Amino acid sequence: MTLKGNGAPEGISYGRGSSMTQTRLRFYIGELDWQGQPVPAICFDEVERYLGTHYPGFTLYHTEGFWQGSRESSRVYEVLTLGGPDPAIVSEYFAQVCGQRAGLVTIETVEVITCTT
């Protein structure tokens, strides 16, 4: 990402009277596939590479939850966007990379932040 003199990424203006919107998204990706088998680590490596390429950075953490009556571990990727690709593309990419081994992907918009100068 290239920053201009005012600290704004290229293509984004922070001039007087302008506004910028950031969205905090969470991608919950199940660690088990549809048959209850562990999703191969290479699938997560590819998703992390994709996120690192298309978003400014991400936070990764793990969570345990219940889905349809059974306990399931998920990897949670949280990103703060300044645009970037449509979030649904991440789940499409995950399904493309992992095929039938892909786990459930849930996308949640956590927060929308608008700054006006």
PLM ranges: what are they?
Residues L3, G7-T117:
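Positively charged, small/polar-rich N-terminal and surface patches that mediate targeting and assembly
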